[in-house]
Structure formats: structure tokens, C-alpha cells
Amino acid sequence: MNLLRKSLAVEPDGPAANWGHLFLRVSAGLMIFYIHGLHKLEGWIAYLQHGTPWTLAGEVAGMHVPAPLASAVAATLVQFICSLFIVVGLFTRINAALLACALGGAILQNLLASRDPQLAILYTLVVVTLVFLGGGKYSLDARISSNMETKRKENKA
């Protein structure tokens, strides 16, 4: 009976919730970094170094987006940098919101190319969740916030 009671308990600030939040943030951030950010960055570097056609820029141009190369670079940098900031929990809400916008473009890109957008949709749902939740207890956001609160109290005293 004790196991059943524990499994039904709702503790939004309990240890399990905090560790779950950390796991969600780190795993999603690493997956977006690896699958979206790093892959796009490698394509951009190959384009810059060797003039190799950059698939992403071509697909963005096919979407009739103004300045497709600049848009592809922006999407690449957002997915590369913001995902790493999410992993460490730094400015989590801002980075998650930026990633949600970039992933919205990935959803559209997949739909227009007749590909399954399911993975991009799933990542978008996770980062939108992080917009609402923030970085959590085990994040740099929490550490910075705690330090700011301590300094505020010291200055007030």
C-alpha cells in the first residue's frame, strides 16, 4: 500500500520532480544539439570551407523565406547554442522560446518536403514545456537567482 501511495503522490517540488526536470532538460537539450544543431553546423562549415551545397539553405530557399542563407545560419546558431544553454540551465526560458521558434521552422520545413515532422513536433513540445517550467532546481538559473536573492537581502540589511 505504501508503494501505491508513493506512486500517486504529487510533490511538484520534491526530489523526484527535480531530478525528472533535470533529466528532461538535459536529455532534450543534448538531443536537439546533436540531431539539429551539430548536423546543421557541420553543413554550414562544409559550405564555408569547400562551397559544398548546404541542404538546409536550399530547403529554406524552397520555402520562399527572405534571405534564406541568413535564415539558415540563424536557425543553425539558435539550435546549436540555445540547446547547450538549455543543457546547463542558463536563461532556460529565453533559450527554450528561441528554440521553439526555430523548431517551428523545422516542422514547416519537414511538412513542405513531405517528411514526417513528428520528431520536430516532439522537441517543440518539450521546449515549450521548458518555457513554462524554467531551468529547475538543478540549473544555473536557480544558482544565479539564489545568489541574486542573497545579495538583495544583504543590501537591504
PLM regions and their residue ranges:
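Perimembrane loop-to-helix junctions flanking transmembrane segments
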Residues: 47-66
